[in-house]
Swiss-Prot record:
Its EC number is 1.14.99.60. Belongs to the COQ7 family. GO terms for molecular function: 3-demethoxyubiquinol 3-hydroxylase activity; metal ion binding. This is 3-demethoxyubiquinol 3-hydroxylase. SUPFAM superfamilies: Ferritin-like. It comes from Xanthomonas oryzae pv. oryzae (strain KACC10331 / KXO85). Keywords: Cell membrane, Iron, Membrane, Metal-binding, Monooxygenase, Oxidoreductase, Ubiquinone biosynthesis. One of its GO terms (biological process) is ubiquinone biosynthetic process.
Length: 217
């Protein structure tokens, strides 16, 4: 029997306030991680200016990716029809909050900053998540699978191109990659729909644009 999503038991104003707070926390706040930073015990070896600039650009991309993931998952969860689906999305979002905090910490260590366009990234991802969720929970889960698979691929790219001595960034990205793969597997097991071919392609193009811009801004 399908269970009603808990969000549907709250008033529209309650739901609006919850979503607004989530957006503010993600974009402007500094939400704490529930798990220890994977780089905590890894030596912070000094990078030269070019290595530091490149590492910061990559970690800014990863931070934006987590902002987008939060927007996507919260948008999907807001319109989820089934309580189990909503729980899955919010649980994944919590792990993405850990990633967000770890990437923010590493950016600070690299004397850099998050993307100036984070409000735009979040808003666009939230809208996409809500639209996907309105098509049905299977569509919503399908977007989770495709998103996480594409994130896995760009994490692999970053692990290849990070400076060899930047082991702190590498430690963070390795754990993130494990988490993303698990999120995709869990979404598939929960009944994700395979998305029509044009959608993954469009998502890949949007991701490429985001990475190009976020590396600098």
């Amino acid at each position: 029997m399908t269970q009603t999503s808990p969000s549907r038991l709250h008033s529209p104003l309650d739901r609006l306030l919850v979503e607004a707070q989530r957006a503010l926390d993600t974009v402007f706040g500094n939400p704490p991680a529930e798990r220890p930073n994977p780089a905590a015990d890894t030596p912070d070896i000094a990078l030269d200016p070019e290595q530091r600039r490149h590492a910061a650009g990559l970690m800014r991309i990863n931070h934006v990716g987590e902002v987008c993931a939060q927007g996507l998952y919260f948008g999907q969860a807001a319109v989820a029809r089934d309580a189990h689906t909503q729980h899955h999305l919010l649980e994944a979002a919590q792990e993405e909050t850990d990633h967000l905090a770890w990437c923010a910490d590493r950016l600070h260590e690299l004397d850099s900053r998050p993307s100036l366009l984070n409000p735009l990234w979040y808003a666009g991802s939230y809208a996409l998540g809500a639209l996907a969720g309105l098509r049905g929970d299977d569509w919503s889960l399908g977007f989770v699978v495709e998103t996480e698979r594409q994130v896995e691929a760009h994490l692999d790219e970053h692990l290849e191109t990070l400076p060899d001595i930047d082991q702190r960034s590498r430690a963070i990205l390795r754990v993130m990659k494990i988490d993303e793969a698990r999120h995709a597997d869990q979404a598939e097991q929960a009944g994700a729909r395979q998305l029509p071919a044009p959608i993954p392609g469009a998502m890949a193009l949007a991701s490429k644009l985001m990475k190009t811009v976020a590396y600098r801004l």
